[in-house]
């Protein structure tokens, strides 16, 4: 399966039990910031934004004072799982980022999608990739 198929079929899909509820944008990005696959709606990000995200995975709490920035959008960092998941909130939407051995799985959402639904979609794919040694 291509990386694009993972984004299209497992991240940008209808959320279980909620037809027409899907993430706003999604991507799979290597730890080095190289995009493996992304939705057409995923924001263009700056290298320093990706560096900040990677630093927060290695030093949990790094982004808390300044917020998480992606594509020029600032998210308030909320509770995640140290070294494994970063979650952010902005207005009625937010972001979930799951770290795997080689990649970061991104999901961005807006209402009516809930934070929990975004977490489920992103973390399920991230856990699968971890099981596959990715």
Swiss-Prot record:
Q: Which GO terms label this protein's molecular function in UniProt?
A: actin monomer binding
Q: Which residues carry this modification: Phosphothreonine?
A: 114
PROSITE patterns in the cross-refs: PROFILIN
Span-the-membrane segments of this chain are none
Top-level division of the source organism's lineage? Eukaryota
Output the Gene Ontology cellular-component terms.
Answer: cell cortex; cytoskeleton
> SUPFAM superfamilies, alphabetically?
Profilin (actin-binding protein)
Q: Which segment of this protein is annotated as the motif Involved in PIP2 interaction?
A: 84-100
**Residue pairs linked by disulfide bridges in the UniProt entry:** 13-118
Please describe the post-translational modifications of this protein: Phosphorylated by MAP kinases.
Cell compartment(s), UniProt: Cytoplasm, Cytoskeleton
Q: What is its main location?
A: cytoplasm
- Other remarks in the entry: The variability of the residues taking part of IgE-binding epitopes might be responsible of the difference in cross-reactivity among olive pollen cultivars, and between distantly related pollen species, leading to a variable range of allergy reactions among atopic patients.
Q: What does this protein do, in the record's words?
A: Binds to actin and affects the structure of the cytoskeleton. At high concentrations, profilin prevents the polymerization of actin, whereas it enhances it at low concentrations.
- Assembly information from the UniProt record: Occurs in many kinds of cells as a complex with monomeric actin in a 1:1 ratio.
| Family label | Belongs to the profilin family.
Official protein name in the record: Profilin-1
Source species taxonomy: Eukaryota, Viridiplantae, Streptophyta, Embryophyta, Tracheophyta
């Amino acid at each position: 399966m291509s990386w694009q198929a993972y984004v299209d079929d497992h991240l940008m899909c209808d959320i279980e039990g909620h037809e027409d509820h899907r993430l706003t944008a999604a991507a799979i990005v290597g730890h080095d910031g190289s995009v493996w696959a992304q939705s057409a709606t995923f924001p263009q990000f700056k290298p320093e934004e990706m560096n900040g995200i990677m630093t927060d995975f290695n030093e949990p709490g790094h982004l808390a004072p300044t917020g998480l920035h992606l594509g020029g959008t600032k998210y308030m960092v909320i509770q995640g799982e140290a070294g494994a998941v970063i979650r952010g909130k902005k207005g009625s939407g937010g972001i979930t980022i799951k770290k795997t051995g080689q990649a970061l799985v991104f999901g961005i959402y807006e209402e009516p999608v809930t934070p929990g639904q975004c977490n489920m979609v992103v973390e399920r794919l991230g856990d699968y990739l971890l099981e596959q040694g990715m």
